């Protein structure tokens, strides 16, 4: 019996040893994706941002991708952080991309507008992957790309409502390029820095500084609800915000009169689209009625912007929300030195 028992145990060990090595990684801050690595095969599962738990796509591959087409400048924020811009062969409106070297700009092909990419140009580039964002269910662009016989990958980071959830999508790009360890390291560093600053934000609440966002455009003023990306940033920065307790993940449309009622006495004004106080007044003279305007405490996110319209805020800030958080905490304390993305209007 002892010999039979020994042989059975030995066979059991062999069977266990022969099982394929599997490493499954789900998002820590997001339910938007899952990455499974089994031996030399990687599977990225993307979940629908509109139907919770519903699989939107699965991408299975055995080699890192070498020729990438991107439809959003935000994708370049992740790719640049990983040092992989040399893998990009096409992008929508490259003049609107901040994180490209002159060499990259000469080499990369413009594939047209992100809402209607040029399929002929994409086909001629012979990419092995097209990274897409989808703006709605039933978006026709993914089917058009797949009809060319080219694999696609949905990048839905823009639907995430918390800063760390958006930043975590760098792990998807790490899997695509075969540099998962580097992507995990970047994200861990971001989480650590953001967590430390969020604790500082808790302390700043006692200062009682209030914040407002956006501006009036054609009669409507959109402000972030408390459950949005920016609403969460305001909370983590330690700012008092009128709609911080509104759990919606959508923007709230206000009339100018409502905005004045809600924010006339706000201390800090961020995220307006004007480049100067004079321009802000020209858009609507009532902008001058706000305390923040009168105190010259108005900021946009254009410190790292180019005349072409490229703006690093839409790229690296997605990867590094701790930099945005630090900017917000600085201006709440009246400190404008060393701001990374924010620029005071004068």
Pin down the residues of each PLM region:
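Soluble non-cytosolic domains of exported or imported proteins
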Residues: 69, 113-117, 135-139, 160-167, ...
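A short, structured surface patch at a secondary-structure boundary
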Residues: 46-53, 61-124, 129-135
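Flexible, glycine-rich surface segments
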Residues: 199-284
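Bacterial Sec-dependent N-terminal signal peptides
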Residues: 1-26
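Bacterial Sec-exported substrate-binding components of ABC uptake systems
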Residues: 18-76, 182-212, 278-281, 294, ...
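Structured C-terminal subdomain patch of bacterial secreted/periplasmic proteins
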Residues: 66-67, 160-185, 271-346
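Second-shell loop/turn segments in exported
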Residues: 64-67, 78, 107-113, 129-132, ...
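Extracytoplasmic ligand-binding site segments that recognize negatively charged/polar headgroups
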Residues: 94-99, 138-141, 156-171, 208-232
